[in-house]
């Protein structure tokens, strides 16, 4: 419609309510660009990609991020300057693709090792390892894990932290979920709700 509208300004037969001419557009061979993919990917190197390719396309061609690669801060360098830090979690968790911009000739994609990996187990919907940013908290981790299951104890979680010499154990209350920050190697456990009643009353004898 855009092309038809623009061409109709020059060729009268294309526009109007009853046009007597048509536009047929065929896309031929697309231009290719050279992009360098470095760091923690399966197959780092220089790749020839379509000029319509984005960072996600390039990572796919390189075999994806390896076991120690970061998904939270993938750098796109253009003309010696970092122009984007791509957070794959924004796409996986929220469906946002704002950072997945189109690549240009000579772009460099750098995948650094992750900084913080935390495991959450127990009564959450997606128990597994998650990469966390330095400012993220227990609340962020619970969001990534899909939230509590129906039989979980939601008032507190247990956290085991490896300090380098010994293990530290924390009981984090619900009110602190949004402020308690996580460290690399933390283990968070969400227990099941206790098999008891909070407000149980027992009545015995002759009751009328």
Question: Where do the language-model regions lie?
Answer:
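Ser/Thr/Pro/Gly-biased, low-complexity, turn-/loop-rich segments
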Residues: 1-208
């Amino acid at each position: 419609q855009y092309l038809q509208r623009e061409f109709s300004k020059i060729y009268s037969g294309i526009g109007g309510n009853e046009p007597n001419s048509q536009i047929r557009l065929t896309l031929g061979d697309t231009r290719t660009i050279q992009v360098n993919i470095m760091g923690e990917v399966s197959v780092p190197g220089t790749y020839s990609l379509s000029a319509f390719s984005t960072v996600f396309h390039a990572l796919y061609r390189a075999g994806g991020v390896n076991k120690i690669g970061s998904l939270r801060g993938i750098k796109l360098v253009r003309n010696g300057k970092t122009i984007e830090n791509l957070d794959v979690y924004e796409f996986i968790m929220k469906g946002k693709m704002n950072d997945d911009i189109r690549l240009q000739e000579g772009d460099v994609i750098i995948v650094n090792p992750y900084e913080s990996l935390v495991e959450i187990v127990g009564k959450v919907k997606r128990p597994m390892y998650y990469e966390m940013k330095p400012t993220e908290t227990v609340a962020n981790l619970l969001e990534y894990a899909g939230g509590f299951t129906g039989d979980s104890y939601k008032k507190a979680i247990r956290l085991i932290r490896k300090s380098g010499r010994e293990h530290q154990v924390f009981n984090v209350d619900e009110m602190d979920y949004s402020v308690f920050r996580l460290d690399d190697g933390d283990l968070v456990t969400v227990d099941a709700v206790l098999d008891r009643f909070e407000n149980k009353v027992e009545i015995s004898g002759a009751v009328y």
